[in-house]
Regions:
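Short beta-strand/turn micro-motifs composed of small residues
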Residues: 132
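PAPS-dependent sulfotransferase catalytic core
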Residues: 1-100, 105-106, 122, 135-166
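Short, well-ordered alpha-helical scaffold segments within catalytic/effector domains
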Residues: 82, 86, 113-116, 177
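ATP-dependent NMP and nucleoside kinases share a basic, alpha-helical "lid"
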Residues: 111-129
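Generic, ordered loop/turn and secondary-structure boundary motif
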Residues: 41-42, 110-111, 172
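Acceptor-substrate binding/catalytic loop of class I
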Residues: 75-76, 170-177
Length: 177
């Protein structure tokens, strides 16, 4: 029987998922996947529909990444192939043989309409940790990150008004403040 991810850290962007994933990954019973945010179960959020700006920032090529094992640690990628997702799981198992939990920490699952059903189908007994943050603090933190990476040029109030007019905002296309 093949191993499966059985611990999912799902959270709003800029809510502390990276810090919590790093902390959890230090526990001997938790094996983090080589890609912190593989986004595999957010099947409605895929690179072909992302904005060109987001794709440039993402710099993701699934085929190229999986050509050479062991796979490098990476913050984010959108794994479409079930086989490739299993390769991440298998590497985590090999790296952390004493694990109890295999950790997938994808923030995209919070924004995906498909992820809940996909996760339940994949691992109905999985543990899920949901991380949230004060929405105003989270939005401003997200704004400063977008500004840092050149994804935003407007002031915060103008940017928030623009995003608020979108219904709904789309992951990988808009900032989703």
């Amino acid at each position: 029987m093949k191993s499966k991810a059985n611990l999912f850290l799902i959270g709003a962007a800029k809510s502390g998922t990276t810090a919590l994933a790093a902390t959890l990954g230090q526990h001997p019973a938790i094996a983090p996947l080589p890609i912190k945010e593989p986004g595999h179960f957010s099947t409605d959020l895929r690179t072909p529909v992302f904005s060109s700006r987001y794709n440039r920032l993402l710099q993701w090529d699934e085929a190229a990444y999986f050509k050479k094992a062991p796979f490098e640690e990476r913050h984010i990628g959108f794994i479409e192939s079930e086989l490739n997702y299993q390769k991440l799981v298998d590497q985590a198992v090999a790296t952390y043989p004493e694990h109890t939990y295999l950790l997938d920490a994808s923030t995209a699952y919070l924004y995906s309409a498909n992820a809940p059903a996909q996760l339940r189908h994949y691992a109905a007994d999985a543990k899920i940790v949901l991380l949230l943050r004060n929405p105003i603090d989270r939005a401003y933190s997200h704004y400063t990150m977008a500004l840092k990476y050149g994804m935003e040029q407007e002031g915060p109030l103008q940017a928030f008004k623009r995003e608020a007019a979108l219904h709904p905002a789309h992951w990988g296309q808009d900032e989703c403040y």
